[in-house]
């Protein structure tokens, strides 16, 4: 594996870990949180939080009531959990 491929792979792993961290924060706050609140709790830049939330929302893993939240766990999480 080339150095470039390793960098891409480790970056992919990092974003998965960050996404999982966001999901855990939302699990602890069922009423939902804004992007800013999520960023404060996980120590990530708002732009990073926004990018990850958008991807998670596209997959149904998080849901929001507006452009900036509040965000909460989405319906796909429930569907996935029922198969465990």
Where do the language-model regions lie?
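N-terminal helix-turn-helix
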Residues: 2-84
């Amino acid at each position: 594996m080339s150095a470039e491929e390793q960098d891409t792979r480790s970056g992919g792993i990092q974003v998965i870990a960050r996404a999982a961290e966001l999901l855990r924060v939302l699990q602890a706050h069922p009423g939902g949180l804004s992007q800013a609140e999520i960023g404060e709790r996980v120590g990530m830049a708002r732009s990073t939080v926004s990018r990850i939330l958008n991807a998670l929302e596209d997959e149904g893993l998080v849901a929001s009531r507006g452009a900036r939240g509040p965000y909460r766990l989405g319906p796909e999480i429930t569907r996935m959990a029922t198969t465990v």
